[in-house]
């Protein structure tokens, strides 16, 4: 947005706030025409941008002077010169999620720890409930 448009919008908000508070002010705002509506926000560079981007498209932004690169998937950098490592690439579909499945060995170790803990707790509770010393439980 241009600065003139923002200033007119701000002035209209102030005028509306005065009108809502009971201080009626009548004014007419000038018609705003935007000459840049015919120019797309982003357009391709053309022949002068051939070879500027190594792995992507050369573009011109309407509000910023200069050539910029829109990198292809898997590349990054000012001129798309760096390869993104496969481990760090984001999916093209933002709705996909990556799930990590633990190895069976880790699952077995965790289940074993849980079983040993449960058995130890049950023996501890049994000895507290019966209040028998461990030596008395052993038959000579």
From Swiss-Prot:
Sequence ranges on the Extracellular membrane side: 19-100
Cytoplasmic-facing ranges: 122-140
Residue ranges constituting the EGF-like domain according to the UniProt record: 41-81
Site entry: Cleavage (By host protease): 96-97
Residues the record marks as carrying a glycan: 34, 95
Conditions for induction: Expressed in the early phase of the viral replicative cycle.
Membrane-spanning intervals of the chain: 101-121
GO biological process: one example: epidermal growth factor receptor signaling pathway
Record keyword Ion transport present: no
Signal peptide annotation: 1-18
Disulfide-bonded cysteines: 45-58, 53-69, 71-80
A cellular component annotation (GO) from this entry: host cell membrane
InterPro entries: EGF-like_dom, GF_C11R
Keyword terms: Disulfide bond, Early protein, EGF-like domain, Glycoprotein, Growth factor, Host membrane, Host-virus interaction, Membrane, Secreted, Signal, Transmembrane, Transmembrane helix
GO molecular function (one): epidermal growth factor receptor binding
Alphabetical list of PANTHER family matching this protein: PROEPIREGULIN, TRANSFORMING GROWTH FACTOR ALPHA
Assembly information from the UniProt record: Vaccinia growth factor interacts with host EGFR and promotes EGFR dimerization.
Family classification: Belongs to the orthopoxvirus OPG019 family.
Stated role: Stimulates cellular proliferation (hyperplasia)and mobility around infected cells to promote rapid and efficient spread of infection. This effect is beneficial for virus replication in vivo, because poxviruses replicate possibly better in proliferating cells than in quiescent cells. Acts by binding host EGFR, inducing its dimerization, autophosphorylation and leading to activation of several cellular pathways regulating cell proliferation or cell survival.
Name of protein: Pro-vaccinia growth factor
Organism: Vaccinia virus (strain L-IVP)
Gene designation per UniProt: OPG019
């Amino acid at each position: 947005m241009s600065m003139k448009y923002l200033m007119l919008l701000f002035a209209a908000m102030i005028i509306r706030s005065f009108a809502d508070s009971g201080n009626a002010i009548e004014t007419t705002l000038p018609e705003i025409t935007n000459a840049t509506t015919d120019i797309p926000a982003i357009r391709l560079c053309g022949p002068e941008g051939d070879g500027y981007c190594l792995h992507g498209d050369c573009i011109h932004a309407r509000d910023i002077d200069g050539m910029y690169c829109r990198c292809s998937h898997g590349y990054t950098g000012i001129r798309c010169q760096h390869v993104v490592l496969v481990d760090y690439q984001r999916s093209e579909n933002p709705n996909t999620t990556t799930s990590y499945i633990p190895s069976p060995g880790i699952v077995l170790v965790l289940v074993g720890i849980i079983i040993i803990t449960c058995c130890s707790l049950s023996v501890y509770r049994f000895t507290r409930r019966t209040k028998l010393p461990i030596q008395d439980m052993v038959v000579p």
